[in-house]
Amino acid sequence: MLLQTIPEGLGLGALLVAVCAVGIRKGAVGMVHLYDPKVQERCMALGLTTREKIKRDALRFKAICIPMYLAYVLLCVYAINGAHTFWSGFWQCLVILSVMNLIDRFGIDGYWVGHTRAWVIPGTEDLMPYISKADKQKKWLFGTMGMAVFSLILAGIGMLL
């Protein structure tokens, strides 16, 4: 089953990359809701966005993307892979979400945001790196723990389906 769930995790990671690519298609300010508050404040001071737009974009991201990601995982684990027990569902969810988390940490945060110009917002370069060492540590900790918690919740939901 591991050989099936790892590619499913890669698919979820690709979905995350696609969401980010769409979000920054007109410039990185389109995803400024994911940046540190200092960067957000600078973008507002420069007239690149407003607090209302940042809040609206953050809400839209949470309302559309998170349910889409969770539905993808449930579809893979229960409809495609046919998990029947809580623990089988939990482990499959955990593998899929963990692979996506690795893509997010290394591929998106580590490389795309950290080593390319795609996420640079003009006028905020002095605030780089956009993801500080402390933020990276928090993302690793909460990302890893969060994936386990989400996996428990999804396995519980899967038992109700």
At which residue positions do the language-model features occur?
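Core segments of transmembrane alpha-helices
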Residues: 60-78, 139-153
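Cytosolic-side membrane-entry/anchor segment at the start of a transmembrane helix
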Residues: 24-65
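Hydrophobic alpha-helical membrane-embedded segments
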Residues: 6-31, 96-112
